[in-house]
């Protein structure tokens, strides 16, 4: 065989080998593309709601002391040189988070003990606001209104005003767009403290970037909303927007009083269905409900999540929003609250858009910020869904 013939044979074999290699690569690419398409389709089907808005949310009802997770508690203790009851994350979780089978309000309230201990200094309060805000930002929250009761942070000598100033400092140190709501508390012998909270709210009130509203929280069944008429008359006189916890431990009548006082938002409002007239009043006045499913299940406001009325209210045209309440104690996130509504009620992307739109419209902030939030959340887009 000549050198030329040998060269030609080698070239033929190489061309054949190349064709086989190319063919094999094409087959592999085709298989990979098919698998990738299937995986993407499955992922989209499983989480099309999250994809619709890139996992971005608004939390209007979030208590600072109820949002202290294990990592945050450990950081607050280290910063202040405090000793926690255990070094074990697993054991600390038991102190901070209610068990899945929470059977009593005492089990729930016990989880506030360590956060209350950690939030009695300006440093602790400042860092708590910053850490909680950073934490929820990492979970997809783009705007939040963090509420706390200044009178709960005076046990070690800090004044209500110093507590507010510390919280404002923490707000400045986070990149999350957030505001503060100051809570007055239901109870005995604290009228002066509540009045001071209202006066300080007026002093520090801004349209955005600080204190934007006041609230009334605490044992609703023991201390009826109707008892606080004068307190909120003063808030109205001073031009302070307010939300009131109502329709949670007490029934629909509590919500009626809150609306009569001038509340534009109701914390929870779960039980308005008990009185059709109150349902009609909520719709007529355009009042927004701040609903918190996991919280309401754990405090036994509802017996079963399948009975939760959020979707019924949404379908009835009531302005409802989805929130966390006490995310650290409940072991939840706002993304998880949306997933729960998907699981139990087949929440659609369009319904999520409505919930987020309601949250933007009800937020205690400026129109400019609301427009920014609408843009971030793509609320003007039409969401297509094949869900039934």
Region locations from a protein language model:
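Detector for intrinsically disordered, low-structure N-terminal pre-sequences
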Residues: 13, 26-28, 43
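N-terminal secretory signal peptides that target proteins for export/translocation
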Residues: 1-18
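Conserved hydrophobic beta-strand within the GNAT/NAT acetyltransferase core sheet
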Residues: 242-244
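Metal-cofactor-binding active-site regions of metalloenzymes
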Residues: 39, 43-240, 249-254, 260, ...
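Bacterial N-terminal signal peptides
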Residues: 25-38
């Amino acid at each position: 065989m000549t050198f030329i013939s040998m060269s030609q044979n080698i070239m033929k074999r190489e061309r054949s080998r190349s064709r086989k290699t190319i063919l094999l690569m094409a087959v592999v690419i085709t298989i990979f593309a098919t698998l990738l398409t299937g995986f993407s389709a499955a992922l989209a089907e499983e989480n099309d709601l999250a994809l619709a808005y890139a996992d971005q949310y608004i939390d209007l009802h979030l208590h600072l002391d109820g949002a202290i997770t294990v990592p945050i508690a450990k950081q607050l203790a280290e910063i202040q040189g405090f000793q926690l009851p255990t070094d074990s994350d697993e054991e600390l979780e038991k102190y901070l988070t209610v068990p899945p089978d929470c059977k009593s309000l005492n089990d729930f309230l016990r989880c506030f003990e360590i956060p209350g201990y950690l939030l009695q200094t300006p440093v602790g309060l400042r860092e708590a606001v910053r850490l909680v805000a950073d934490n929820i930002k990492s979970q997809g929250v783009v705007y939040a209104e963090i509420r706390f009761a200044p009178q709960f942070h005076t046990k070690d000598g800090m004044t209500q005003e110093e507590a507010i100033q510390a919280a404002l400092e923490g707000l400045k140190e986070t990149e999350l767009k957030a505001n503060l709501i100051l809570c007055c508390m239901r109870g005995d012998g604290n009228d002066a403290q509540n009045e001071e909270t209202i006066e300080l709210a007026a002093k520090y009130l801004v349209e955005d970037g600080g204190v934007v509203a006041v609230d009334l929280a605490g044992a609703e069944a023991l201390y009826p909303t109707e008892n606080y008429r004068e307190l909120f008359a003063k808030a109205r006189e001073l031009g302070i927007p307010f939300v009131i916890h109502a329709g949670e431990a007490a029934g629909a009548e509590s919500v009626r009083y809150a609306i009569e006082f001038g509340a534009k938002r109701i914390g929870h409002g779960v039980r308005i269905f008990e009185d059709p007239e109150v349902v009609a009043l909520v719709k007529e006045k355009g009042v927004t409900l701040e609903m918190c499913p996991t919280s309401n299940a754990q405090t036994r406001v509802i017996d079963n999540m399948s009975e939760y009325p959020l979707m019924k209210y949404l379908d009835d045209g009531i302005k409802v929003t989805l929130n966390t309440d006490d995310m650290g104690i409940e072991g939840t996130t706002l993304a998880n609250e949306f997933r729960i509504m998907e699981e139990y009620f087949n929440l659609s992307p369009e319904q999520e858009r409505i919930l987020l739109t309601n949250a933007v419209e009800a937020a205690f902030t400026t129109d400019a910020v609301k427009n920014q939030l609408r843009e971030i959340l793509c609320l003007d887009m039409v969401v297509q869904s094949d869900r039934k």
